[in-house]
Amino acid sequence: MSSNKASFFTRLRRLCRLAVWLFKTGKNLRGIDGGCPESRNRAVIELGRGVLAALDIGLEVGRPAPEHPNGVLVAANHVSWLDIFAMSAVYPSSFIAKQEIKSWPVLGKMGQNAGTVFINRNSRRDIEPINRAVCETLQRGQNVSFFPEARTSSGLGLLPFKAALFQSAIDAGAKVLAVALRYYDETGKRTARPSYADVGLPTCLWRIVSMKKLTIRVDFVCVADAAESEDRYALKDKIEESIRAVVADDADIAV
């Protein structure tokens, strides 16, 4: 009977390639610090693709991103630390991320150079200044991505969205792009193994490199005009419902 896990050699090779990628990236972080938007976007795309390639992770784009100007607030469901790299590989942007990531080796510095806004999820006092910062970033024509669930899920369903950070799109008069992320194993079935909702980063990474094959599917679901929403709650509901429908689409065949 064949194992449904990658061989130990494959796991070790993937970890070694990730270590090499981290080392090389750590020496060239200035590529995403400053410069023109085009060069910064290219650097962000390369970072996203580099991590996925090192770990042998496939990337599929289901519904493509619609044509729209820059300065878009991107909202996605949150499953794994891989979410950021998958999204960056196809749609470069800054991110709103939890404060703990700022201290992560290499990845924290990458986030800072890419313009990531780090937030304390336990402090409501952070919301107003964060919304101002995101609004200003959107008005400069830079895309900003965030995860309105505010924490990771199994990826087979959706946690309730938080409405607070949608206010930045309303204040900026920006568009909001809904993105659905789904993870599949080597059999083509949905999987929750890449999630770190209930495990730490080392365990999550080991689960990922242990999979025979992992594919991330990115669907750009819809675009909402924040100016047409009654308030941030109505805007949140529209985006949440659109993502929930896609995430639930084939979750019944998950393993």
Swiss-Prot record:
Converts lysophosphatidic acid (LPA) into phosphatidic acid by incorporating acyl moiety at the 2 position. InterPro entries: AGP_acyltrans, Plipid/glycerol_acylTrfase. CDD domains: LPLAT_AGPAT-like. Keywords: Acyltransferase, Cell inner membrane, Cell membrane, Lipid biosynthesis, Lipid metabolism, Membrane, Phospholipid biosynthesis, Phospholipid metabolism, Transferase. GO terms for molecular function: 1-acylglycerol-3-phosphate O-acyltransferase activity. The keyword NADP does not apply. It comes from the Bacteria. This is 1-acyl-sn-glycerol-3-phosphate acyltransferase.
